[in-house]
């Protein structure tokens, strides 16, 4: 049963993680709805000059698509379906299951079983029981 709980918890956590990733985008990507920080706006729009004035050129033997920026791709995958076992697959879709036996050797409870009458306990304590709380009249203990 613990394994079923672990599967359920992982299912919920993965679903929450994926839903939050789809709403805010992956880490490190720019959110176009958020304004840019006003600290240094020029660094966002223009490339910084190379202090050594070295131009990096694209080699001729490598295809151009390797140098392109990848597009942001958010993939929303629903959590996997909960698998309950083969015995549930065999049932028709509208089958009502009144109870599920945990152990097959136990009969289901009957509506007509009478409860066992209970005995009243004796309210007076036995003579050898001593009261040792601080509220007892002759208490020698100090708490």
UniProtKB/Swiss-Prot annotation:
Query: Some GO term, biological process aspect, for this entry: which one?
Result: response to toxic substance
The signal peptide annotation in the UniProt record is 1-22
* UniProt-annotated stretches for the region Disordered: 28-50
* GO CC terms in record: extracellular region
Subcellular location, record wording = Secreted
Q: What does this protein do?
A: May play a role in protection or detoxification.
Listed A to Z, the keywords are: Detoxification, Secreted, Signal
Predominant subcellular localization, coarse grouping: secreted
Q: What is this protein called?
A: Submaxillary gland androgen-regulated protein 2, isoform gamma
Where are the compositionally biased (Polar residues) regions? Answer: 36-45
The record's section on InterPro entries has: SMR-like
